Amino acid sequence: EALLKAGALQTAIFNSANFSSIATDAKGVMQIFNVGAERMLGYAAADVVNKITPADISDPEELIARAKALSAELCTSIAPGFEALVFKASRGIEDIYELTYIRKDGSRFPAVVSVTALRDAQNVIIGYLLIGTDNTARKQAEEALLKAGALQRAIFNSANFSSIATDAKGVIQIFNGGAERMLGYAAADVVNKITPAD
């Protein structure tokens, strides 16, 4: 009974609509494409299983860049394509990375992908499991924070008041645009260099 429950739990986790679960054979051809992958990518499993690799639904420019970066990092030649997606996992190295997936309709979205090599009893790789999550909301939140920070800096630096802040020793750490205009010093000339008394 415990094994049946464990099997049911594994099935429920694997079929979660919140994660794309893509299992491939050793050559990278998709063998399993779960409900979450169907929802995120717009393909039916029948459209991709035994037909394409995860590289075919990934941004080709990112695959080239990833292959170059991994080749430099690991001092070996790594081909763009599926090999770039699974190279670390094939060597037993934990691999979680950001990647742009391409949906069936051609639209793109950022994903965080975790890759694991699947091995048989003799420790021979028989395939790979790629678990992905849609990273769109986090990316949008990061962009909103960057824009908010830029807006705050713009307001702070265009203010008609001077704002000067020092550290515990009295050395200037903040010197805004208003202070530059009123006092005639550039921030670069005073920050981390002098105290207001100087």
How would you name each of these model-derived features?
Residues E1, A8-T11, L85-K88, K104-D105, ...:
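Intrinsically disordered, low-complexity segments enriched in polar/charged residues with Gly/Pro
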Residues E1, N15, A55-D56, E83, ...:
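Active-site-proximal helix/loop capping residues that flank conserved catalytic or ligand/cofactor
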Residues E1-G7, A121-V124, T133-G149:
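PAS-associated C-terminal cap
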